[in-house]
Amino acid sequence: MTRKHGELEAEVLHALWSLEESGATNIGSQDILRTIEPKGSIALTTLLTILSRLCDKELVRRRKLDGKSLVFESVLSRDEQAAASLLELLEGSHNPSLVVANFVDSLSPEIKDALRSSLRKDK
């Protein structure tokens, strides 16, 4: 099965977040490659291209470690990126109020409670 570039970018970003969430630092391309399933599903050159694109989109930062090896870190956490994506969807809608109303209607009671709590804190 072939994957689209967007799917590969998401897979690489999720692998990077998983490594960061486990406490890893100075994450190199080989670390990310080892995290992606199934093993051997993408070539190192493909991974480096995807990481470069994610850097261009300002989703990932790269820097040289010891002036030689490249290491990568996400610009936003997984949760921050999810929130940014939701905001982008709302801002792109012709009727954001209706989108929010439909979204809230589909939430579980627990998530609705968390949303109410967040809105109260925002006042």
Set out the residue ranges of the language-model regions.
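Short acidic, hydrophobic short linear motifs in intrinsically disordered regions
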Residues: S22-T35
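Glycine-centered, phosphate/nucleic-acid-interacting loop/turn motifs that mediate DNA/RNA or nucleotide
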Residues: E58
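Short, cationic-aromatic polyanion-contact patches
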Residues: L65-S85
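Amphipathic alpha-helical dimerization/coiled-coil segments
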Residues: A84-K123
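Short, hydrophobic-biased segments on the C-terminal half of alpha helices
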Residues: L48-S52
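Short alpha-helical segments that sit at the start of domains
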Residues: M1-A15, L19, S77
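Short beta-strand "wing" residues that participate in macromolecule-binding interfaces
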Residues: R62
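Short helix-coil junctions and helix-kink-helix linkers
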Residues: R34-I42
